[in-house]
A protein has these predicted regions:
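A detector for short, charged/polar N-terminal pre-domain segments
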Residues: 6-10
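N-terminal core-binding DNA-recognition domain of tyrosine recombinases/integrases
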Residues: 2-5, 16-31, 40-138
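Gly/serine-rich nucleotide phosphate-binding loop at the start of the catalytic core
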Residues: 13
């Protein structure tokens, strides 16, 4: 069984199952699994704060707990929520296109797991989500 990172201890059960799936079934490295967790934790912190703006300031974005996220809340995620999240990442967190693209990939994989692999969700709300364009640099 894949070793669970202490980073993941404050996640909700569905996310814990997904991270276990990535490590044991998909064979992802512990570091890769941790990166998925960090990407998804940031999204669900944003998701909660977007529903309750007071959370952005009190106790602070980095302190928002996600251990109480439910399947119903996950099912309520819309493509518009994710577009707003991408804007938040670019404007407030100063994430470049490559970082945002990785977060899109994490979200896609998570929602595919919930719809295709487990059948917990009937519809994938981010199926039409596009990956941010990454500028190609010229060779040096």
């Amino acid at each position: 069984m894949a070793k669970r990172s202490s980073l993941q201890d404050s996640s909700f059960p569905i996310l814990q199952q997904f991270l276990g799936y990535l490590g044991t079934i998909k064979g992802k490295s512990p570091r890769t699994v941790d990166e998925y967790y960090l990407d998804l934790r940031t999204f669900f912190r944003y998701f909660k704060a977007n529903r309750d703006p007071a959370l952005f300031d009190d106790p602070g974005f980095e302190d928002i707990l996600i251990d109480d996220i439910t399947l119903d809340q996950i099912a309520s995620v819309t493509l518009s929520d994710v577009y707003r999240y991408m804007n938040f990442l670019e404007t407030k967190r100063k994430n470049g296109a490559a970082a945002r693209a990785r977060k899109v990939s994490s979200l896609r994989t998570f929602f595919k797991y919930l719809t295709v692999t487990t059948g917990l969700l009937k519809e994938n709300p981010i199926l039409q989500l596009e990956t941010p364009k990454i500028k190609k640099s010229l060779p040096k």
